[in-house]
Amino acid sequence: MAVPVLIIGAGIIGCAIARELSARGVHVQIIDDRPVAGGATQASAGILAPYIEAHDRGLLLDLGVRSLALYDDWIAAVSGDAGVPIEYRRPGTLEIALDADHAADLRRATSGGNPQWLDRDATCALEPALGSIEGALFVTTHGYVAAPELTAALARAAEHHGATFRRSRAERIERVSSHLRVVTASGAIDADRVVLAAGSWTGALAGDRWAAAPVRPVRGQLLQLGWQGPPVTRILWGPECYIVPRADGSLLVGATVEDVGFDERATAAGVRDLLDAACELLPQGWGATFMNVRVGLRPATPDDLPLVGEGETEGLVYATGHYRNGVLLAPLTARLVADLIVEGKRDPALEMLAPGRFASRT
């Protein structure tokens, strides 16, 4: 018997969709050859900052703002379903200017979010550990969530509503009579609908020409440091790195942007570059404890917008290509996909996110 919905991918997007669908009464199975949050999600700092990620007005900013507005209620609901706390804070971001030219650019940034320009003295009064800077753009609505922790909670919440998880590697998707068949390393699974949330591996699985080409892996390395200096309380965003203060006192420093294919190695060069950038912002960083480095392959598209919506193959739905914004866009993506599958409702945004938008280019 075919399962109603099979989701390929147990990262934050796949697990968010699984929880949303199962909470609406849909029987869902999720497959991945890695553990929950075992891919790009485990190397995410979980930043929720649409006004930095998309300074210029456009669809990405609109999507980010919509999704951020869902976060408070979403986290409360997921935590309640899963029965576990989730580290989630909204301390704001300080986008740091190190020189006068960058400061002038930031002063002109008026893309919403109630940004406030702070001069050097005002910025350093908020964050005394900062080094030599010109000032910062302060957005109070921004925050972060512990992405692996959230994804584990989403999986647990989905299971609470009846979803099942299976560790297996999906190899291809086929159309068989009235349903889809996903061939895995441990056998075939038939499904009425398949949601492809496989991130950088989308092209190898897609099964139709629409999305086989556009999604490419971009390596991101993320450091965790044991901070020994004055407390850092807000997210710092510099020209070459960002720094996220965690509840345990450690700092996450990210992230490299490397077009190296499917190479998931941590590198000396990546670690060095991030440490140099972090210590330019926080000079006492050289005295921090090096705790670990994580690596993830972020799924990017040519226009930096995700692929969300129906594929060329009947019954196939895409939810992939979120690049640096998977955590930010997770609640909105889950809602868009669930509305499409359960109610047949097509949000206007899906037209711009359609997987077929690159078909004429490939």
Spans of features found by a protein language model:
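Helix-loop-beta segment of a Rossmann-like dinucleotide-binding subdomain
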Residues: 84-95, 114-161, 256-260, 320
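Dinucleotide-binding Rossmann-like beta1-alpha1 core, especially the glycine-rich loop
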Residues: 46-126, 277-279
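N-terminal Rossmann-like FAD-binding beta1-loop-alpha1 element of flavoenzymes
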Residues: 3-29
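C-terminal catalytic lobe of FAD-dependent flavoproteins
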Residues: 147, 284-362
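Active-site substrate-recognition segment that forms the wall
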Residues: 16-24, 33, 46-47, 84-89, ...
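Helical element adjacent to the flavin cofactor pocket in flavoenzyme catalytic cores
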Residues: 137-193
